[in-house]
Amino acid sequence: MSEAEVPPVARGQAALLGPAEVRALAEEFGVRPTKQLGQNFVHDANTVRRIVATAGVGREDTVLEVGPGLGSLTLALLDVVDKVIAVEIDPNLAARLPVTVADRAPELADRLTVVGADAMRVKPSEIPGEPTALVANLPYNVAVPVLLHLFSELPSLRTALVMVQAEVADRLAASPGSKIYGVPSVKANFFGAVRRAGAVGRAVFWPVPKVESGLVRIDRYAEPPWPVDDAHRRRVFAVIDAAFAQRRKTLRAALGGWAGSPAEAERRLLEAGIAPSARGETLDAAAFVRLAATQP
């Protein structure tokens, strides 16, 4: 069996973090989790192992991690893949992460690259190499914008397995017609197939959050069914935003501002094969793409 065929089994070379280690590191580094940065650190080794296993990443993957914090998930990833790029907005945590990895997984330390940046604004030029998978415990207050930004900016990303607030996970994976189907659902589906990939209880975090968490997986379309260039994406996203800004209204009324008038909105809707009396939550991503194509 070649190296490429070896299944993604942990090397067992990383000493994963437990509750005592997480608190000790936080005290040592002078870290106080803040709501502003959405910091809730995972302190359960079985949970991070499950996340890595569910992500399905292997040796050949270059994994992008956002918000590595104290390094719980980072260590579990390094035990399976050959390269991890961690993007951390907190300068203190960004500086300390390599120290933690060198201490707890010295044989794997050279596989980690830390980028001190805001994941909502990070540019491809700041990311070394071409990451193939996003695996992260995303800061809950910015999870959706970060996810969409990274899929927009990094075409090399083939998959994502992210932990987010359970309610957000449900919205991302919602289907047309659902009460919780909305802007995040459609925009995520613009890039790929989205599905719920599990639940995560509150007890595995420090501090303990007030909400439950969930895992969401996105698999980018191998052959995109529509153009994915930035200009086209912006046109499609503008229609999505307009349709859901007044979600109780018919699309004829809701898209009046986008089209210039309700009458013009009706004309474009009919051209795209969509009933003017329909509402935004009934349309899938393909319908919004057709609608955007009617714009002169």
From Swiss-Prot:
Residues at which S-adenosyl-L-methionine binds: 40, 42, 67, 88, 118, 137
Cleavable signal peptide: none
Keyword Cell wall biogenesis/degradation in record: no
Subcellular location: Cytoplasm
Entry EC number(s): 2.1.1.182
Reactions that this protein is recorded to catalyse: adenosine(1518)/adenosine(1519) in 16S rRNA + 4 S-adenosyl-L-methionine = N(6)-dimethyladenosine(1518)/N(6)-dimethyladenosine(1519) in 16S rRNA + 4 S-adenosyl-L-homocysteine + 4 H(+)
Top EC class of this enzyme: transferase
GO CC terms, sorted: cytosol
Origin: domain of life: Bacteria
InterPro entries according to UniProt: KsgA/Erm, rRNA_Ade_diMease-like_C, rRNA_Ade_Mease_Trfase_CS, rRNA_Ade_methylase_Trfase_N, rRNA_adenine_dimethylase, SAM-dependent_MTases_sf
CDD domains: AdoMet_MTases
UniProt keyword list: Cytoplasm, Methyltransferase, RNA-binding, rRNA processing, S-adenosyl-L-methionine, Transferase
Alphabetized GO MF terms: 16S rRNA (adenine(1518)-N(6)/adenine(1519)-N(6))-dimethyltransferase activity; RNA binding
Role this protein plays: Specifically dimethylates two adjacent adenosines (A1518 and A1519) in the loop of a conserved hairpin near the 3'-end of 16S rRNA in the 30S particle. May play a critical role in biogenesis of 30S subunits.
Similarity section: Belongs to the class I-like SAM-binding methyltransferase superfamily. rRNA adenine N(6)-methyltransferase family. RsmA subfamily.
Protein name as it appears in the record: Ribosomal RNA small subunit methyltransferase A
Organism for this UniProt entry: Rhodococcus jostii (strain RHA1)
